[in-house]
């Protein structure tokens, strides 16, 4: 598997128009979810830093509330973080979420999408997920990306992008 991060570094460009890296990760409820299972549907793949934090909760709830609208447009929603499957399951129950959440505990998929970044807080640096969303078409091509996402109106912006396909 190639890393999108390698493409970005070597060509100094974004990843739009490239094939999506293969995504196959443990999911809530058990088992493995592979994005290829959804073809020929579009996929909105959203990466978020941590379950049960205020901004991540707002984002996941917003996507869940818009799920039916995305489904009408032949589009599936999938969330990814480094949290465990058990954490995802608690997060889903507590917030009545209805989208699958994948556990990338080793950050391999986060690295492949170049969302695993150095961050800093209170003078300390650490590695973490940069909130990002990718729109992947039914052929597995990345057709739009949102980086350093601010959640206000984000779901609406993603929905508009899907409508424009």
Which role does the model predict for each range below?
Residues 2-165:
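Chalcogenol-based redox active-site neighborhoods
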